[in-house]
Amino acid sequence: MSILKSFIEVSEDSHFPIQNLPYGVFKPTLNDQARIGVAIGDFVCDLSVLADLKLFDGKLKDTKVFHQENLNSFMSLGKELWSEARKTIQNLLSSETSTIRDNKEYREKIFHSISSVTMLLPARIGDYTDFYASKEHATNVGIMFRGKENALMPNWVHLPVGYHGRSSSIVVSGTPLKRPWGQTKSDEPDSLPTFNPCRLLDFELEMGALIGGESTKLGEPISIESAKDHIFGLVLLNDWSARDIQKWEYVPLGPFLAKNFGSTISPWVVTMEALQPFATKPPTQDPQPMKYLQEQGNTTFDIELSVSIKSPKMSKPHKVSTSNLKYMYWTLTQQLAHHTVNGCNMNAGDLLGTGTISGPTEDSYGSMLELSWKGSKVVSLGTETNEERKFIQDGDSVILSGLCKGNGYQIGFGNCEGTILPADKRQ
Protein backbone atom coordinates (compact mmCIF):
# COMPACT_ATOMS: atom_id res chain seq x y z
CA MET A 1 0.00 0.00 0.00
CA SER A 2 1.49 3.33 -1.07
CA ILE A 3 1.94 6.09 1.50
CA LEU A 4 0.06 9.33 0.89
CA LYS A 5 2.48 12.08 -0.16
CA SER A 6 2.21 15.85 -0.50
CA PHE A 7 3.59 17.99 -3.31
CA ILE A 8 5.12 20.05 -0.49
CA GLU A 9 8.48 18.51 0.33
CA VAL A 10 8.43 17.00 3.82
CA SER A 11 11.61 15.67 5.40
CA GLU A 12 11.62 12.22 7.01
CA ASP A 13 12.11 13.72 10.47
CA SER A 14 9.35 16.32 10.11
CA HIS A 15 6.55 16.30 12.68
CA PHE A 16 4.10 17.54 10.06
CA PRO A 17 3.57 15.19 7.09
CA ILE A 18 0.30 15.12 5.15
CA GLN A 19 -0.96 12.39 7.52
CA ASN A 20 -0.90 14.92 10.38
CA LEU A 21 -2.16 18.37 9.32
CA PRO A 22 -2.46 19.87 12.83
CA TYR A 23 -4.44 23.08 13.22
CA GLY A 24 -3.02 26.31 14.60
CA VAL A 25 -3.65 30.06 14.74
CA PHE A 26 -1.02 32.34 13.24
CA LYS A 27 -0.15 35.79 11.94
CA PRO A 28 1.93 35.96 8.73
CA THR A 29 3.36 39.26 10.05
CA LEU A 30 2.77 41.03 13.36
CA ASN A 31 0.45 43.56 11.69
CA ASP A 32 -1.70 40.92 9.99
CA GLN A 33 -5.01 39.59 11.18
CA ALA A 34 -4.77 36.23 12.93
CA ARG A 35 -6.15 33.29 10.97
CA ILE A 36 -6.20 29.49 10.99
CA GLY A 37 -3.78 27.20 9.21
CA VAL A 38 -2.44 23.67 9.17
CA ALA A 39 1.21 22.69 9.34
CA ILE A 40 2.68 20.78 6.39
CA GLY A 41 6.43 20.17 6.45
CA ASP A 42 8.17 23.50 7.07
CA PHE A 43 5.14 25.51 5.96
CA VAL A 44 1.79 26.77 7.20
CA CYS A 45 -1.10 26.30 4.79
CA ASP A 46 -3.42 29.31 5.20
CA LEU A 47 -6.95 27.91 5.40
CA SER A 48 -8.53 31.36 5.19
CA VAL A 49 -7.05 31.68 1.70
CA LEU A 50 -8.35 28.23 0.74
CA ALA A 51 -11.79 29.40 1.84
CA ASP A 52 -11.50 32.68 -0.10
CA LEU A 53 -10.55 30.71 -3.21
CA LYS A 54 -13.70 28.57 -2.76
CA LEU A 55 -11.65 25.39 -2.46
CA PHE A 56 -13.88 23.96 0.27
CA ASP A 57 -17.17 22.42 -0.78
CA GLY A 58 -20.14 20.73 0.85
CA LYS A 59 -21.19 22.25 4.17
CA LEU A 60 -17.94 24.22 4.35
CA LYS A 61 -18.38 25.85 0.93
CA ASP A 62 -18.90 29.41 2.18
CA THR A 63 -17.33 28.99 5.60
CA LYS A 64 -15.71 31.83 7.53
CA VAL A 65 -14.49 29.68 10.43
CA PHE A 66 -10.91 29.74 9.15
CA HIS A 67 -10.81 33.55 9.24
CA GLN A 68 -11.26 33.53 13.02
CA GLU A 69 -8.65 34.39 15.66
CA ASN A 70 -9.09 31.03 17.37
CA LEU A 71 -10.27 27.51 16.59
CA ASN A 72 -13.41 27.68 18.74
CA SER A 73 -15.92 28.19 15.91
CA PHE A 74 -14.40 25.39 13.85
CA MET A 75 -14.15 23.06 16.85
CA SER A 76 -17.83 23.68 17.65
CA LEU A 77 -18.91 22.32 14.23
CA GLY A 78 -18.48 18.72 15.33
CA LYS A 79 -16.87 15.52 14.15
CA GLU A 80 -18.57 15.29 10.74
CA LEU A 81 -17.27 18.67 9.56
CA TRP A 82 -13.84 18.17 11.16
CA SER A 83 -13.51 15.05 9.04
CA GLU A 84 -14.83 16.80 5.92
CA ALA A 85 -12.32 19.63 6.33
CA ARG A 86 -9.42 17.22 6.87
CA LYS A 87 -10.37 15.19 3.79
CA THR A 88 -10.55 18.33 1.62
CA ILE A 89 -7.23 19.76 2.87
CA GLN A 90 -5.49 16.41 2.53
CA ASN A 91 -6.76 16.06 -1.04
CA LEU A 92 -5.69 19.60 -1.99
CA LEU A 93 -2.18 19.03 -0.62
CA SER A 94 -1.79 15.60 -2.18
CA SER A 95 0.90 15.10 -4.79
CA GLU A 96 -1.83 13.69 -7.04
CA THR A 97 -3.95 16.89 -7.04
CA SER A 98 -3.01 19.72 -9.41
CA THR A 99 -5.33 22.49 -8.11
CA ILE A 100 -2.68 24.15 -5.92
CA ARG A 101 0.35 22.15 -7.01
CA ASP A 102 0.34 23.59 -10.54
CA ASN A 103 -0.85 27.11 -9.72
CA LYS A 104 2.05 29.37 -8.69
CA GLU A 105 -0.26 32.27 -7.81
CA TYR A 106 -2.25 30.06 -5.45
CA ARG A 107 0.89 28.66 -3.82
CA GLU A 108 2.30 32.13 -3.14
CA LYS A 109 -0.92 33.15 -1.38
CA ILE A 110 -1.48 29.93 0.54
CA PHE A 111 1.88 28.95 2.02
CA HIS A 112 4.02 30.68 4.64
CA SER A 113 7.28 29.44 6.11
CA ILE A 114 6.67 28.27 9.68
CA SER A 115 9.82 30.09 10.75
CA SER A 116 8.43 33.41 9.50
CA VAL A 117 5.01 33.41 11.19
CA THR A 118 3.90 34.22 14.73
CA MET A 119 1.97 31.41 16.41
CA LEU A 120 -0.82 32.28 18.84
CA LEU A 121 -2.88 30.31 21.34
CA PRO A 122 -4.94 27.88 19.24
CA ALA A 123 -8.14 28.36 21.23
CA ARG A 124 -10.00 30.74 23.49
CA ILE A 125 -9.84 28.50 26.52
CA GLY A 126 -12.96 29.02 28.59
CA ASP A 127 -12.39 26.47 31.34
CA TYR A 128 -9.35 24.41 32.26
CA THR A 129 -9.42 21.25 34.35
CA ASP A 130 -6.26 19.38 35.32
CA PHE A 131 -6.29 15.72 36.27
CA TYR A 132 -3.96 13.49 38.29
CA ALA A 133 -4.30 10.41 36.12
CA SER A 134 -0.85 8.74 36.07
CA LYS A 135 -0.62 5.93 38.60
CA GLU A 136 3.17 6.05 38.52
CA HIS A 137 3.22 9.79 39.21
CA ALA A 138 0.58 9.61 41.94
CA THR A 139 2.41 6.70 43.58
CA ASN A 140 5.79 8.45 43.44
CA VAL A 141 4.42 11.63 45.00
CA GLY A 142 2.51 9.61 47.60
CA ILE A 143 5.65 7.71 48.63
CA MET A 144 7.58 10.97 48.99
CA PHE A 145 5.03 12.65 51.21
CA ARG A 146 3.12 9.80 52.92
CA GLY A 147 5.27 6.68 52.62
CA LYS A 148 4.85 3.43 50.65
CA GLU A 149 2.01 2.09 52.78
CA ASN A 150 -0.18 5.11 52.07
CA ALA A 151 1.08 6.13 48.62
CA LEU A 152 -2.29 6.18 46.84
CA MET A 153 -5.33 7.73 48.47
CA PRO A 154 -8.30 5.31 48.67
CA ASN A 155 -10.32 7.15 46.01
CA TRP A 156 -7.55 7.19 43.39
CA VAL A 157 -8.26 3.82 41.72
CA HIS A 158 -12.01 4.49 41.65
CA LEU A 159 -12.18 7.86 39.87
CA PRO A 160 -10.03 10.28 37.84
CA VAL A 161 -8.95 12.86 40.42
CA GLY A 162 -8.94 16.43 39.09
CA TYR A 163 -9.13 20.09 40.04
CA HIS A 164 -10.15 23.27 38.25
CA GLY A 165 -7.19 25.33 37.02
CA ARG A 166 -6.84 28.86 35.69
CA SER A 167 -7.38 29.43 31.96
CA SER A 168 -6.34 33.11 31.91
CA SER A 169 -2.67 32.28 32.51
CA ILE A 170 -2.33 29.61 29.83
CA VAL A 171 0.25 30.80 27.28
CA VAL A 172 1.49 29.55 23.93
CA SER A 173 4.90 27.93 23.48
CA GLY A 174 7.73 30.46 23.43
CA THR A 175 6.17 32.78 26.00
CA PRO A 176 8.53 33.40 28.96
CA LEU A 177 7.17 33.24 32.50
CA LYS A 178 8.38 35.00 35.64
CA ARG A 179 9.29 33.02 38.71
CA PRO A 180 6.26 33.37 41.01
CA TRP A 181 6.08 34.83 44.51
CA GLY A 182 4.09 33.20 47.29
CA GLN A 183 3.98 32.03 50.86
CA THR A 184 6.27 29.17 51.86
CA LYS A 185 7.09 27.54 55.17
CA SER A 186 10.12 25.51 56.18
CA ASP A 187 9.93 22.17 57.97
CA GLU A 188 11.65 23.60 61.04
CA PRO A 189 9.55 23.29 64.22
CA ASP A 190 7.74 26.51 65.20
CA SER A 191 8.81 28.24 61.95
CA LEU A 192 6.53 30.89 60.50
CA PRO A 193 5.54 31.25 56.83
CA THR A 194 7.52 33.71 54.71
CA PHE A 195 6.71 35.60 51.51
CA ASN A 196 9.36 35.06 48.84
CA PRO A 197 10.01 33.94 45.26
CA CYS A 198 9.51 30.23 44.63
CA ARG A 199 12.70 28.24 45.28
CA LEU A 200 11.45 24.86 44.02
CA LEU A 201 10.12 25.57 40.52
CA ASP A 202 9.12 22.53 38.50
CA PHE A 203 7.72 21.46 35.14
CA GLU A 204 5.02 18.86 34.60
CA LEU A 205 4.96 16.80 31.41
CA GLU A 206 1.33 16.64 30.36
CA MET A 207 -0.95 16.56 27.35
CA GLY A 208 -4.08 18.64 26.97
CA ALA A 209 -7.34 17.71 25.24
CA LEU A 210 -9.32 20.49 23.57
CA ILE A 211 -13.06 19.94 23.70
CA GLY A 212 -15.14 20.36 20.55
CA GLY A 213 -18.67 19.93 19.26
CA GLU A 214 -21.79 21.79 20.35
CA SER A 215 -21.90 22.95 23.95
CA THR A 216 -23.52 20.38 26.17
CA LYS A 217 -26.50 21.35 28.30
CA LEU A 218 -26.27 21.82 32.04
CA GLY A 219 -27.47 18.62 33.67
CA GLU A 220 -26.65 16.34 30.72
CA PRO A 221 -23.58 14.09 31.12
CA ILE A 222 -21.35 12.93 28.27
CA SER A 223 -21.35 9.14 28.17
CA ILE A 224 -18.15 7.14 27.99
CA GLU A 225 -19.31 5.85 24.58
CA SER A 226 -19.67 9.34 23.08
CA ALA A 227 -16.80 11.07 24.91
CA LYS A 228 -14.36 10.56 22.03
CA ASP A 229 -16.64 12.56 19.72
CA HIS A 230 -16.32 15.58 22.02
CA ILE A 231 -12.50 15.73 21.88
CA PHE A 232 -11.18 17.74 18.93
CA GLY A 233 -7.47 17.16 19.41
CA LEU A 234 -4.44 17.17 21.67
CA VAL A 235 -1.64 19.58 22.54
CA LEU A 236 1.46 19.33 24.71
CA LEU A 237 1.03 20.94 28.12
CA ASN A 238 3.58 22.07 30.70
CA ASP A 239 1.73 22.71 33.94
CA TRP A 240 4.46 24.70 35.70
CA SER A 241 4.42 24.11 39.46
CA ALA A 242 5.87 25.97 42.46
CA ARG A 243 6.47 23.04 44.79
CA ASP A 244 7.35 24.99 47.95
CA ILE A 245 4.32 27.25 47.57
CA GLN A 246 2.15 24.20 46.85
CA LYS A 247 3.37 22.34 49.94
CA TRP A 248 2.21 25.12 52.30
CA GLU A 249 -1.05 26.10 50.60
CA TYR A 250 -2.61 22.88 49.30
CA VAL A 251 -4.38 21.70 52.49
CA PRO A 252 -7.36 21.37 52.42
CA LEU A 253 -8.49 22.51 48.95
CA GLY A 254 -5.50 21.69 46.75
CA PRO A 255 -3.05 23.82 44.74
CA PHE A 256 -3.77 27.50 44.06
CA LEU A 257 -0.93 30.01 43.58
CA ALA A 258 1.45 27.10 43.00
CA LYS A 259 -0.23 26.45 39.66
CA ASN A 260 -2.09 29.53 38.42
CA PHE A 261 0.95 31.68 37.53
CA GLY A 262 1.30 30.01 34.14
CA SER A 263 0.81 26.90 32.01
CA THR A 264 2.34 26.48 28.54
CA ILE A 265 0.75 24.67 25.59
CA SER A 266 2.05 23.86 22.12
CA PRO A 267 0.55 25.88 19.23
CA TRP A 268 -0.40 22.95 16.98
CA VAL A 269 -3.50 20.87 17.74
CA VAL A 270 -3.15 17.30 16.47
CA THR A 271 -6.61 15.95 15.70
CA MET A 272 -8.00 12.71 17.05
CA GLU A 273 -8.47 11.52 13.48
CA ALA A 274 -4.74 11.92 12.79
CA LEU A 275 -3.94 10.04 16.00
CA GLN A 276 -6.28 7.12 15.32
CA PRO A 277 -3.61 4.86 13.71
CA PHE A 278 -1.72 5.06 17.01
CA ALA A 279 -4.60 4.04 19.26
CA THR A 280 -3.67 1.39 21.81
CA LYS A 281 -5.00 -0.29 24.93
CA PRO A 282 -4.56 1.51 28.27
CA PRO A 283 -3.24 -0.21 31.41
CA THR A 284 -5.52 -2.77 33.05
CA GLN A 285 -7.64 -1.14 35.73
CA ASP A 286 -8.02 -2.98 39.03
CA PRO A 287 -10.54 -2.75 40.57
CA GLN A 288 -12.85 -2.45 37.59
CA PRO A 289 -14.23 1.09 37.54
CA MET A 290 -17.91 1.90 37.85
CA LYS A 291 -20.07 1.32 34.80
CA TYR A 292 -20.06 4.96 33.65
CA LEU A 293 -16.24 4.74 33.35
CA GLN A 294 -15.99 1.33 31.70
CA GLU A 295 -14.65 1.21 28.14
CA GLN A 296 -13.26 -1.43 25.80
CA GLY A 297 -10.58 -1.57 23.13
CA ASN A 298 -7.88 0.88 22.09
CA THR A 299 -8.88 3.96 24.04
CA THR A 300 -5.54 5.70 24.50
CA PHE A 301 -2.61 6.55 22.19
CA ASP A 302 1.02 5.55 21.76
CA ILE A 303 2.59 9.02 21.87
CA GLU A 304 6.29 9.15 22.75
CA LEU A 305 7.00 12.17 24.94
CA SER A 306 10.21 13.82 26.05
CA VAL A 307 11.43 16.67 28.25
CA SER A 308 14.64 18.59 27.60
CA ILE A 309 16.26 21.43 29.54
CA LYS A 310 18.52 24.14 28.15
CA SER A 311 20.38 26.42 30.54
CA PRO A 312 21.67 29.86 29.48
CA LYS A 313 25.17 28.34 29.19
CA MET A 314 24.15 25.51 26.86
CA SER A 315 24.08 25.65 23.07
CA LYS A 316 21.44 22.91 22.76
CA PRO A 317 18.90 21.25 25.06
CA HIS A 318 19.64 18.08 27.00
CA LYS A 319 16.96 15.39 27.32
CA VAL A 320 16.16 14.54 30.94
CA SER A 321 13.07 12.34 30.56
CA THR A 322 11.13 10.20 28.08
CA SER A 323 7.60 8.98 28.71
CA ASN A 324 4.44 7.98 26.83
CA LEU A 325 0.75 8.88 26.97
CA LYS A 326 -0.11 5.16 26.94
CA TYR A 327 1.14 4.86 30.54
CA MET A 328 -1.82 6.91 31.80
CA TYR A 329 -4.11 4.88 34.08
CA TRP A 330 -7.20 7.02 33.43
CA THR A 331 -7.82 7.79 29.74
CA LEU A 332 -8.91 11.11 28.27
CA THR A 333 -12.38 9.74 27.55
CA GLN A 334 -12.74 8.50 31.12
CA GLN A 335 -11.68 11.92 32.37
CA LEU A 336 -14.32 13.63 30.23
CA ALA A 337 -17.05 11.16 31.20
CA HIS A 338 -16.26 11.62 34.89
CA HIS A 339 -16.04 15.42 34.56
CA THR A 340 -19.60 15.54 33.23
CA VAL A 341 -21.29 12.65 35.04
CA ASN A 342 -22.82 15.14 37.49
CA GLY A 343 -24.23 17.23 34.63
CA CYS A 344 -21.36 19.72 34.30
CA ASN A 345 -21.68 21.35 30.88
CA MET A 346 -18.73 21.59 28.45
CA ASN A 347 -17.96 24.11 25.71
CA ALA A 348 -15.76 24.06 22.62
CA GLY A 349 -12.33 25.31 23.65
CA ASP A 350 -12.39 23.88 27.16
CA LEU A 351 -9.08 22.22 28.04
CA LEU A 352 -8.53 19.01 30.00
CA GLY A 353 -5.00 18.37 31.26
CA THR A 354 -3.94 14.76 31.76
CA GLY A 355 -1.83 15.43 34.81
CA THR A 356 1.87 14.58 34.93
CA ILE A 357 2.67 11.62 32.66
CA SER A 358 5.26 9.45 34.38
CA GLY A 359 6.42 6.04 33.25
CA PRO A 360 7.63 2.99 35.20
CA THR A 361 11.35 3.82 35.18
CA GLU A 362 13.34 6.65 36.75
CA ASP A 363 14.22 8.14 33.36
CA SER A 364 10.51 8.33 32.46
CA TYR A 365 9.38 10.52 35.34
CA GLY A 366 7.48 13.62 34.23
CA SER A 367 8.63 16.19 36.79
CA MET A 368 11.76 17.40 38.56
CA LEU A 369 10.07 16.51 41.85
CA GLU A 370 10.33 12.87 40.80
CA LEU A 371 13.57 13.02 38.80
CA SER A 372 15.39 14.60 41.76
CA TRP A 373 13.24 12.62 44.21
CA LYS A 374 12.12 15.63 46.21
CA GLY A 375 15.50 17.30 45.79
CA SER A 376 17.50 14.43 47.30
CA LYS A 377 19.60 13.91 44.17
CA VAL A 378 20.76 15.89 41.16
CA VAL A 379 19.68 15.62 37.52
CA SER A 380 22.49 15.94 34.97
CA LEU A 381 22.14 18.42 32.11
CA GLY A 382 24.79 16.61 30.07
CA THR A 383 28.49 16.92 29.41
CA GLU A 384 28.51 20.18 27.44
CA THR A 385 28.52 22.30 30.62
CA ASN A 386 28.38 19.57 33.31
CA GLU A 387 25.53 21.45 34.98
CA GLU A 388 23.12 19.78 37.36
CA ARG A 389 19.64 20.59 38.58
CA LYS A 390 17.27 19.65 41.35
CA PHE A 391 14.64 22.16 40.22
CA ILE A 392 14.34 24.76 37.45
CA GLN A 393 16.58 27.83 37.71
CA ASP A 394 16.20 31.33 36.24
CA GLY A 395 17.06 31.37 32.55
CA ASP A 396 16.35 27.67 32.06
CA SER A 397 14.21 26.69 29.09
CA VAL A 398 12.07 23.55 29.32
CA ILE A 399 11.10 21.91 26.03
CA LEU A 400 8.41 19.23 25.75
CA SER A 401 8.08 17.19 22.56
CA GLY A 402 5.71 14.48 21.37
CA LEU A 403 5.85 12.01 18.48
CA CYS A 404 3.89 9.06 17.07
CA LYS A 405 5.98 6.76 14.88
CA GLY A 406 4.06 5.28 11.97
CA ASN A 407 4.87 3.06 9.02
CA GLY A 408 6.87 5.34 6.71
CA TYR A 409 5.88 8.56 8.46
CA GLN A 410 5.64 10.11 11.89
CA ILE A 411 3.13 12.48 13.45
CA GLY A 412 4.41 15.07 15.88
CA PHE A 413 3.25 17.95 18.02
CA GLY A 414 6.23 20.24 17.50
CA ASN A 415 7.67 21.70 20.69
CA CYS A 416 6.16 23.20 23.81
CA GLU A 417 8.83 25.54 25.18
CA GLY A 418 8.96 27.99 28.05
CA THR A 419 11.77 29.96 29.69
CA ILE A 420 11.77 31.03 33.33
CA LEU A 421 12.63 34.68 34.01
CA PRO A 422 13.76 35.99 37.42
CA ALA A 423 11.06 36.97 39.88
CA ASP A 424 10.07 40.62 40.16
CA LYS A 425 11.92 42.57 42.83
CA ARG A 426 9.55 43.34 45.70
CA GLN A 427 9.85 44.85 49.15
From Swiss-Prot:
Catalytic activity field: 4-fumarylacetoacetate + H2O = acetoacetate + fumarate + H(+)
Residues that hold Mg(2+) according to the record: D239, K259, S263
Keyword Magnesium on entry: yes
Residues given in the record as substrate binding sites: Y132, R146, Q246, Y250, T356
Signal peptide: none
Transmembrane segments: none
Co-factor(s): Ca(2+); Mg(2+)
Any one Gene Ontology BP term: tyrosine catabolic process
Catalytic center residues: H137
A Pfam family matched in the record: FAA_hydrolase
EC number(s) from the headed UniProt entry: 3.7.1.2
Binding of Ca(2+), residues: D130, E204, E206, D239
Keywords: Calcium, Hydrolase, Magnesium, Metal-binding, Phenylalanine catabolism, Tyrosine catabolism
Molecular functions per Gene Ontology: fumarylacetoacetase activity; metal ion binding
Gene3D superfamilies for this protein: Fumarylacetoacetase, N-terminal domain (2.30.30.230), Fumarylacetoacetase-like, C-terminal domain (3.90.850.10)
UniProt-listed PANTHER family: FUMARYLACETOACETASE
Entry's family note: Belongs to the FAH family.
Protein name: Fumarylacetoacetase
Species per Swiss-Prot/TrEMBL record: Dictyostelium discoideum
Lineage summary: Eukaryota, Amoebozoa, Evosea, Eumycetozoa, Dictyostelia
Gene name per UniProt: fah
